Amino acid sequence: MEDKAIGSQHGYMTTTTGRPADSAPRSEAAPVASPVRGSAPILMHPVRRGVQLLLGLVGFGVATAMMLHSGQGAMPWAVLDQGIVDRTGLAYGWVVLGIGLLVMLAWIPLRQRPGIGTVANIIVISLVIDPALWVLERLLPAPALPAGIGLALGGTVLLGVSTAAYVGARLGPGPRDGLMTGLVHRTGWPVWLVKTVIEVTVVVLGVLLGGTFGWATVVFAFGVGPVVQVAARWLAPSGLTGHP
């Protein structure tokens, strides 16, 4: 005997045998795809970008002065600069400028683009280093070993944080940092590894050319990369690679 569905005054359906009738099949909604995290860059307010760029470049200049005044060893790029100066007899400023231009040529295959931050890098840092050295020479005319160690280590940390700050503003990296970000983008290697490889390579070339070398140079070469990597978590929400 077939079950026939009959209506109920209470608003639900039953069959002639008293069993509840099967409800109409419900159409299941298609699952909504969850957004992929990290698929789009995190936007940074333009004011913050400008302030972060400026503070990062000022900090970079101060950190450079701290390393130079420490007497414990020059930074890797400074070792290379000094080596070329010793071999060629050219003025230090011209060597720095020439290396910067050569490094920017390497941007072409890496598809890096200069920006306002690239120009600001050259201007601001050069304007900050000399006044910072003037202040340090008056506060610590001849730093003893403990003070020199503090300046070298503090300069390494400050330079790493400052690098993450002005590169993270994504207004255009400096010549040397553009090389770093370009290699990170092309190789997929972490920032700390690319930064360390670059610094070690530059140190070796500088020493071979006769540049000054010290323990602080080694600490800087191996330590600044991890500092940049950690600081970038807060100062570079969109990452250190790519374009604005």
Where are these regions (language model features)?
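Core subunits and conserved enzymes of cellular information-processing
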Residues: 9, 14-244
